[in-house]
Regions:
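Conserved, mostly hydrophobic/aromatic
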Residues: 105, 160, 308, 323, ...
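Active-site-proximal loop/turn and secondary-structure-junction residues that shape catalytic pockets
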Residues: 162-166, 310-314, 337-339, 373-379, ...
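Alpha-helix-loop-beta-strand connector modules within alpha/beta enzyme cores
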Residues: 180, 184-185, 231, 285-300, ...
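Active-site-adjacent "gating/activation" loops or surface patches in catalytic cores
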Residues: 313, 318-344
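Flexible, acidic/Gly-rich N-terminal and inter-domain linker regions that tether
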Residues: 1-138, 142-281
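Conserved C-terminal portion of the radical SAM core fold
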Residues: 326-330, 353-407
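Active-site mouth loops of central-metabolism enzymes
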Residues: 96, 303-315, 378-383
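Aromatic/hydrophobic pocket-lining residues that form the small-molecule binding cavity
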Residues: 139, 173, 316, 355, ...
């Protein structure tokens, strides 16, 4: 791997352009020379290798004679998914734990391994599950990944997903936000040795989660090591087979329309379960959150945006006051339709009037609004969807700052 780095540096010193195509050629040539698997020399492994040498073997790194300008060019070559932070802001998405939902929309999936409306196979959800839905662990994992991909992480937008935020107890809301800030303030970036995805080609995310538990102690930030041990001691599973088996019976009943999502979630995650034990310490005071927010003002990774998810009927002055104190700057709001007939037959249990009021209140409190809109709902027609969407984007009572359209 060192030879590839040296070849890149040589090309850059000669003024050559090393784009992805040129980099692939360098990797393939070195793989043939060494008789190695190309995957072992993949681009995603090069930057962590460079970072590790610079940090742990300064004499070796000094021999490469890399000045600041050359390093800047090298990092541009090695950076993974460069568009991800093209705006200068790195986005970190985290997921809250499964919890009863105040809604019962017809179109929402009922995956008992996830908060309502989410599916465990989605990338962010899979990462959250492997990190026990813990905000500190999720932020640490994403900070580590972004760092190892070569992205700047001085400005962070946190996106908190998981259904209706206000459905969670206030103590949990405060704890969750406090831990997000704490992870950023602690600079909770793990070492390369704690990333099994870099150590073995083709490894699954589930297997990576298991191997992470065996990572060297000095490769993990202290709070990460302590927190993972705490969940393990409580009996919280991260193994794919255990996770699937743990909800199988309840999932079968929910899929058969027996009992419902909320009842099943209470049985799986409520008092008397491992998650019930964990819930007892997942709480914090507003003073602790404000302390972490104050520290973050001068931290290495500063929060410049914080997003939560809610429903129009949960948008009240009291809820918005709390959300503002928690540090939020933007609200993701599930609108789905402005056709009252469609809202009713899809069991949204909200009115167009409530949607208008939610928009008005959110603007009054200074929040940006990221709206969700759905096409092809039960009872919808293409013509009706078009009229509905045009109204949503042109009528003054609505006109969100951002919109996500679901098919």
């Amino acid at each position: 791997m060192e030879q590839i780095i040296l070849n890149i540096l040589k090309a850059l010193r000669c003024g050559e352009t090393v784009d992805d195509k040129a980099l692939v050629k360098l990797i393939h040539a070195e793989a043939r020379r060494e008789g190695a698997d190309k995957r072992d020399l993949a681009k995603r492994r090069l930057l962590p290798f460079y970072q590790r040498v610079k940090r742990e073997d300064p004499a070796r790194w000094a021999a490469w004679n890399v000045d600041s300008d050359l390093e800047r060019q090298l990092l541009q070559v090695l950076r993974m998914k460069p568009r991800r932070t093209a705006s200068g802001v790195a986005t970190i998405t985290v997921i809250t734990k499964p919890w009863p939902c105040s809604g019962d929309c017809l179109f929402c999936p009922n995956d008992l391994r996830m908060p309502k409306s989410y599916l465990h196979a989605e990338p962010a959800c899979a990462r959250a599950e492997q990190n026990c839905f813990d905000p500190y662990l999720q932020v640490s994992a994403r900070l580590t990944a972004l760092s190892q991909m070569g992205h700047a992480t001085d400005k962070i937008e946190l996106i908190v997903l998981g259904g209706t935020w206000s459905d969670y107890p206030q103590g949990y809301q405060t704890w969750f936000m406090s831990e997000l800030f704490r992870a950023l303030n602690d600079d909770a970036v793990a070492g390369v040795a704690a990333n099994p995805m870099l150590a073995r080609p083709g490894i699954s995310r589930a297997e990576a989660g298991r191997l992470l538990d065996d990572a060297p102690a000095d490769a993990l930030p202290p709070v990460v090591a302590e927190r993972r041990e705490r969940y393990r001691a409580a009996g919280i599973a991260i193994d794919e087979a255990e996770l699937a088996a743990g909800v199988a019976d309840e999932q079968e009943r929910v899929d058969a329309a027996v009992g419902g999502y909320n009842r099943a979630v209470r049985r799986l995650y409520g008092p008397g379960t491992p998650w019930g034990e964990v819930t007892e310490w997942q709480t914090a005071t507003m003073e602790e959150l404000e302390r972490q927010q104050h520290i973050n003002e001068t931290a290495k990774h500063r929060v410049v945006g914080l997003v939560i998810e809610t429903r129009p009927d949960a948008v009240t002055p009291q809820a918005l006051t709390l959300i503002r104190r928690l540090g939020c700057t933007k609200i993701q709001m599930g609108i789905q339709s402005l056709d009252q007939y469609l809202l009713d037959i899809n069991e949204r249990r909200i009115s167009v009037g409530q949607i208008e009021r939610a928009f008005s209140l959110a603007r009054l409190f200074g929040f940006k609004i990221h709206a969700h809109f759905m096409l092809n709902l039960l009872g919808a027609t293409p013509e009706g969807d078009k009229r509905d969407y045009e109204r949503f984007m042109t009528e003054g009572a609505f006109m969100p700052d951002e919109v996500k359209v679901y098919p």
